[in-house]
């Protein structure tokens, strides 16, 4: 079915709500007569109908060739990475078990494409029930910035793993499962989604990445808003060559 919305009386918020309901449904082809380019930056193109420019919503942002190339890069890259790093995985698992009681793998509930939740795997870097170690001031800082400079919850082994981003290596399994990409925007949780505001529609059109533009920027002290802008820049400017560059920069940063 085709849904054409050409009312000048609708506000941007009302049109955005229409987009949320019908824009990504496979059984509806949505066209809007107003500019949402300042809000939705991916998956849109303009086509005239009776001299009226209508914004149409494309269900597929990448071309078939680009999507195939990215899928191949993700699958074979993750498979090779898991095989090559298997001895390191064993060593890290032993170190975690000796350092503190608790599981080796931590599951973090995050949002994937279309807002579908899944469990992202990480090596455990914190003490079990570590939140009880936080002071009220630290808890407030964590709520605001989603990170702490001197986090008392992190174990000794965890600090080493985080320093070299080794704690995220189990997410290669998520890549093999098709839930993540090697390169993409940073993953977010449901509570974080609200902080993206109008940008959340863009963020959830692609898979979250094991690494990305922000992770290799060399700046760990940037604000949340700038991290969001980096994610949006990647989504707007994706090419397979950009992915290859970021993979190389990620490897060099870790090594």
Each predicted region: which residue ranges?
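Alpha-helical membrane and juxtamembrane elements of multi-pass inner-membrane transport
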Residues: 16, 63-70, 151-158, 190, ...
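N-terminal hydrophobic signal-anchor/signal peptide
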Residues: 1-86
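Acyl-group handling in specialized metabolite and lipid biosynthesis
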Residues: 60, 232-235
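Short, glycine-rich, amphipathic interfacial segments at transmembrane boundaries or analogous
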Residues: 34-38, 43-47, 105-153, 211-230
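Proline-centered helix-kink/hinge sites
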Residues: 34, 53, 87, 103, ...
């Amino acid at each position: 079915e085709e849904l054409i919305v050409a009312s000048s009386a609708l506000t941007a918020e009302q049109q955005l709500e229409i987009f949320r309901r019908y824009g990504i449904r496979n059984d509806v082809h949505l066209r809007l007569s107003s500019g949402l380019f300042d809000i939705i930056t991916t998956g849109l193109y303009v086509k005239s109908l009776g001299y009226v420019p209508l914004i149409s919503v494309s269900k597929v942002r990448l071309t078939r060739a680009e999507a195939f190339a990215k899928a191949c890069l993700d699958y074979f890259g993750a498979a090779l990475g898991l095989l090559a790093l298997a001895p390191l995985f064993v060593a890290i698992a032993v170190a975690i078990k000796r350092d503190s009681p608790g599981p080796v793998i931590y599951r973090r509930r995050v949002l994937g494409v279309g807002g579908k939740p899944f469990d992202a795997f990480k090596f455990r870097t914190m003490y079990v029930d570590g939140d009880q170690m936080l002071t009220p001031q630290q808890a407030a800082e964590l709520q605001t910035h989603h990170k702490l400079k001197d986090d008392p919850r992190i174990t000794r082994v965890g600090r080493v793993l985080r320093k070299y981003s080794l704690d995220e290596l189990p997410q290669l399994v998520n890549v093999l499962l098709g839930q993540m990409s090697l390169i993409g925007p940073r993953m977010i949780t449901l509570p974080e989604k609200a902080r993206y505001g109008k940008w959340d529609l863009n963020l959830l059109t692609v898979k979250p990445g094991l690494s990305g533009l922000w992770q290799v920027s060399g700046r760990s002290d940037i604000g949340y808003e700038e991290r969001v802008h980096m994610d949006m820049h990647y989504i707007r400017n994706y090419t397979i060559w950009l992915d290859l560059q970021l993979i190389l920069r990620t490897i060099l940063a870790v090594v």
